[in-house]
Structure formats: structure tokens, C-alpha cells
Amino acid sequence: MPVCAKAGEWVACLPVGRGRGWRYQSSPPSPPFPPAEGGEDFWKSEVQLDRLRERIQQIKKKRPGYGKILDFYQSVKEAQEKAKTSLKIDSIPLRKEWKTLLSKEGFSLIRKEDFPLDIESSVKLFETLCQVGRDANPHMADQVRKIEETIGRDRTNLRKLFEEGWKEEKIEKVADEWVLDRRVFLFLLQSSIRPSVEAGVDQLRSELNPETWLKEYCPLCGSPPSLSLLKEEVGKRYLLCSFCGYQWRTDRILCPFCKNKDQESLRYFYGEGEETHLIDLCDRCHQYIKTIDARNLKESDPVLEDLGTLHLDLLASREGYKRPAPAPWTI
């Protein structure tokens, strides 16, 4: 029986199968696209974009109804990769006691607002993404028009938001004052700082051991996970941070939101012929996370794989389950 998924102005209908239990065999997925670092990595970035475009075409061929939202994702990624070529951010100073708190008390290494941002690059990327958003869907186009009318030719307000760091409550307050859709405004701002955030993650990567954290929140910035990934022949399970994109190890049989390990109350389902994309349900807290098992997925981008299976999120929602960190692309 087909399921029609509506995400903003995008609609797709696909057949869905069901399953119960947990997977006990898997093979390694490819890592997400790493950020380009400096001018010498320009060609690496281009190769990554070519692979992304190829995968997008594969998904569009299989699921034509996702064409418009996938085109939007591709345009955003291309703009972000272009921004990386001239990115300049400060180094992140770390105090010795921070790592002690990380290991002994379970605090994250930094907070979201601690990521240094290239303000000028973020402002320019925001303006570019507004242009891209005009062709995304009617609601996005309307919100972009309101944003441009509010900001006008003066970048002061926008620059101030970036200078204050990522403070979601402050951003939501500004969105309300400007009578904007919070989700659209947050999406545009977060997508604009993404290159800076990824550069910050690269700075701190050597300070963390992703194999030993085993907690339900990101060891780097403290944010909740947006996706679950299965890697390596033994099927190690990793969580993907909803904010910074860092990946860390977690238990295979576990709800990452309520820590439930009872197999009887943990189950999953997947789309017909799409066993590599699963919805892991917890009957204790009635929340879910999407899991990407890249057994047959070459050079996979987890966010893209998530975006191409929004129909599964709709089915989970219909059954009364919530996703704590929903895909930001459903605007």
C-alpha cells in the first residue's frame, strides 16, 4: 500500500513494507562528505559534489516525486561548498578542564554558540540561500520575500545575529518580531553557518574519541542526534549530531532518547525494497530515529539519504511516534 509523504510543498507516494525486531548483520557505510579545507582541496570538493549529484539522480530516478526537494538540497550544498573555498575562522581555544569535564562529568566539549563563525561568509551565504529559496516552494519563496523586505539593503541586523553565535531562543524571538516562519528562518541561518561549523568540527576532531563516548548526545556540542548509522562489517552503530554533524559510537540495541534497551519495545520498519533505510521505533517513549545501513550505498551522504526517505517519517508520525530532531528540510 503506497504512502504519500508531504514535506512542505513536496509530495511523494511510495510503497512501504513493515518489519519487527532488530538487524544483527550489516556492512560499513561510506562516511559523509568531509568539508573542503583550503584552496588545495577545491578539486576534492568538486569530486564530492559530482558524487552527490550522481546519487541525487539515482534517487530521483527511483522516486520521481522527490525531484524538487532534491534539486533544492543540491543547490544548497553547492552554495555551501563554494563558501568553503574562502572560509576563514578563528581557532577554538580549549581549556584543560573542559576535557576533564568531558571525560568525568559527561559534559560536551563546547556549546553550539562556541563555534567561531566567518561572519562575512555566513552573511553572503545567507543571501545566496535566499535566492535559492525563491525557487524551492511557494512557502519558502514567501518567507524569503519577507526576510529580504525586513533586512533590505542593511546587513546590520543579520550580521548581529551571526556575531552573537548560535542562540536558538534569540533567533526564534527575532523571527517572531519579524513575523517570519521560525523553521524557515532557522533553516536558512543554520545552513549559512554550516561551513564554519564543519571547519570547527575539523579543528576539534582529534580531541575526541568517537568510540568511547556511548552517550545519547553529541560529545562535541551537546546536541541530540538526527540519524543513526551502521558501519563496518560487524555493524557498529553511530549517531549523527543534528547540529554539527559529528558522529559517535552508541549501542546497537538502544533508544538514544530514553535509553531503553528492552528488545520487546524496540522495533523497526522500512520501505519496500529499501532495507537500507529504517525507522527505529521505541514503544516506551514513542519516539523514533532513522537508521541508514549503507550495505549497498556507495559514497553516501546521510542527510541526503534521510531527505530521500521522508515518506518513512510520515508513516512513523501517523502511528503516533515523534522525531526529536526532525529533518530541517521539511519546510
Where are these regions (language model features)?
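N-terminal alpha-helical interaction blocks
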Residues: 49-205
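Short Gly/Ser/Thr- and charged-rich N-terminal loops/segments
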Residues: 5-23, 33-40
